[in-house]
Amino acid sequence: VTEYESCRQLYYLFYDGLFTLSDSFSAAPNLAESYTPGEDGKSGTLKIKHGINFSDGSPLTADDVLYTVNFIKEHPATYGGCVENIESVTASGADTLYFILYEPERHFETMLTFPVIKANSPESMAYPVGTGQFAAGAGDVGYTSLTCRKNSGYHMGRPYLDGFTVRFTNTDLKASASFSSGESDLLFGTDIDVSSAEKVKVYEGRTNRFEFLGFNAAGALFSEDSA
């Protein structure tokens, strides 16, 4: 589940992170109860909240977090940056983990926002099992749609919706056509402007994701003061 950037929007429906980030980039506990850093800043102890279950009813434990960290290290495409400073992590009992870092990191909790997956989940698993507010249900053979149901045991309260269906398309044009015709109620992941379509409401919101634009100041293009 950590390999594909295109699935990121679904992660937040099926999975939870140990911490969440606010608009001011401060970390708030989610699956984690607390994180206590060591004096050297290169180690720390994490406690997991009690009473949290996966959508299949199995309890969340420290082994699940340990498995997730190691899985991301092996498949770093999307969340590799969150774990690259982790030298080692060990589980102690059902609710405690010890982290050793390569370098001191003052706000290490802000890195612990990746989705936690169930330990020993087969990579070939068709439908994800997470602690999030929704659980994946039936999908068609061609993986063009996925039916999702509410997770009645969600640790932060019952979801507002009972369920919904996700439809996957391979072009922006198909996605916008489905939305404009009323077949789909929500659209994301496309650059096509559909704001002019009938009965469409456009909502804009801030995110805490960064985009980086770098300039080679030593290059010939920037050798002039006017540049």
Residue ranges and their predicted role:
Residues 152-195:
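Ligand-site clamp/hinge motif
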Residues 62-68, 162-163, 210-227:
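Alpha-helical secondary-structure segments
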Residues 105-163, 173-174:
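Gly/Pro-rich hinge or "lid" segments in bacterial periplasmic/extracellular proteins
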Residues 33-76:
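Aromatic- and charge-enriched surface segment that lines or borders ligand/interaction sites
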Residues 1-39, 70, 129:
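N-terminal lobe/hinge region of extracytoplasmic solute-binding protein
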Residues 83, 195-209:
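Ligand-binding "clamshell"
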Residues 36, 40, 81-121, 135:
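Surface-exposed binding/hinge segments that line
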Residues 1-11, 31-33, 58, 108-117, ...:
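A structural "hinge/loop" feature
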